[in-house]
Amino acid sequence: MAFNFNWSPLMADASFYTRAQDLLTAALNKSPKPPIIVDDIIVTELNLGSIPPELEILEIGDLAEDRFRGIFKMSYSGDAFLTLKTRVQANPLNTYLLTRPSFATPRPLAAATPLTIPLQITLSDFKLSGFVILVFSKQKGITVVFRNDPLESLKVSSTFDSIPFVRDFLQKEIEAQLRILFMDELPAIIHRLSLRLWVPEYRAGEELQTQTASANGEGPGQDPLASPPQDPVDALGNALNESEIESLSLDSSVETHSLFSQKNLLRLAALTDSQRTLSLFTPSIREVVYRAWTSPSDQTDASGSVTSPFFPVLSRTQSQVGSMSSFPDSASMVSSQSRSSTPFHTFSGYGLSLGAGRHSKAHARKRKKRVVDLRRPKTTDDAPSVSDESSFTESTSAPSICSAPLPVLDEQTDDPVTPPLSPDNDLHLPAIPERHRMSISRPALRRENASEMIRDTAECKPSSNAVGQAIQEEDLSATPRAAVRAHGASVLEKGKQDPDSSAGSSRQLSSTILPFINDNPTGGVVDQALVERLAGEIARRMRDEKFMASNACGPFWDRHSQEESPPPAYGH
């Protein structure tokens, strides 16, 4: 079976080329164009050439006088060519600004000036190879479908062939567009041409649509501003009645074009306001309650939940190195006024967090007032007693390098364990069970030894030599090591000789004094009256605060008094 394809009539028919050019122009402008192309793509020349394609019949599904369906293998390497004409934007900055949002791009003055250049592109040397499904019917026309991408290569000649990177860019972009054209647009173009050629009804309907479109396009256009609107307003927004509109004439200063509809103005204003959200300068929102507070006073107004003392809470506390010190051997916070102005003390944020988050935020103000009362500066006559007591406590409870690798931590002056030189006040202080439960990593042996030694010292009132011997005996009983004595004993001796200078010298306890020295304790008698007066004052303040907070913290103190535990620091 043989078929004869007559290719010459297609080359000779001028109307066929005209119609094909129009269809190709519509197809090229229908798809989204790159932003560099600023004008329509017009097909100025189309020629199918004199070399027909080669067709190989693979399958014939239906064959009759008025219909045909089969599968072909097509190969084409002829002299057909296509010429396109358009305009492109030569300034890349102008193209970049047009494709980006206005609020996110700079505003150049002259650098973004558009520069359009006419461009002419000629496509030639087509090489096609693919499988084609062809369906022919006199009633339905010709349908051609490519099962694969038929375009192998082509040659692109343009105005910018002298610029290599522009030539390569155009070659790549046009090849991509032609692949879409062969797979989607070319079958539709061939189908419409076949309907126009073999179906008279389709031709008549198409001619009628063309006449209707040309008739609508003729004649002058209507000016929507020629007649006044239904609800006219002047340039200032004042409403106008019918008599004022009729009084206006063509010779008057107020023209009809200056009358605008109030409804349209409101719509334009609403549209403008809605577009303002795209700008970076969005107006602030009024009547909005902000849930995030930055100041501590705003935080106290909000109702907070009760925080467990076993989980530390981050709290905003004004603390500085050298002004606050804590004892982290238990879960509760033990803080006092610093005994040194130099940054030699260790600071524990964990203790501060536990102390700040023990109670609910409703009692935050009362807790803050109580802390302020306990941290009032001491008078000048109490300074020697405070320094003597502090140095004595540090010398009794400080560990050695061999037994405790932890740094030397300061005992607090407001701790009930430190000042109870009178036994009556020490035996009735309440116990806090959290300290007993949370002291897991470090034993409380040092705290008990210190309290027992201070209690024995208060009862017997020994001399400074007896105090030094008791310190060495207790230190040996706690841990098996050589009898050592810290620098606190020597500071204690200086406190007796110069009470004014002992307050500053005894407070300078740094971490560099960890190595203890072996020397014999020598010193004077501690001013016992001042120490007892200080201990009584602290105990009286704690009893007053306990009675003042009985309504809010009554169950807390009762629960602590029922449990048996060594007397630790106060509960807050």
From Swiss-Prot:
Q: Where is this chain's protein located in or outside the cell?
A: Mitochondrion outer membrane
Give me the ranges of the annotated region Disordered.
212-236, 355-426, 487-507, 552-572
Q: List the biased-composition ranges (Basic and acidic residues).
A: 371-381
The protein's GO terms of the molecular function aspect are: lipid binding
**Role:** Component of the ERMES/MDM complex, which serves as a molecular tether to connect the endoplasmic reticulum (ER) and mitochondria. Components of this complex are involved in the control of mitochondrial shape and protein biogenesis, and function in nonvesicular lipid trafficking between the ER and mitochondria. Mdm34 is required for the interaction of the ER-resident membrane protein mmm1 and the outer mitochondrial membrane-resident beta-barrel protein mdm10.
Record comment regarding domains: Lacks alpha-helical transmembrane segments, suggesting that it resides in the membrane via beta-sheet conformations similar to those predicted for other outer membrane proteins and porin.
Name of the protein this chain belongs to: Mitochondrial distribution and morphology protein 34
Organism (species): Aspergillus fumigatus (strain ATCC MYA-4609 / CBS 101355 / FGSC A1100 / Af293) (Neosartorya fumigata)
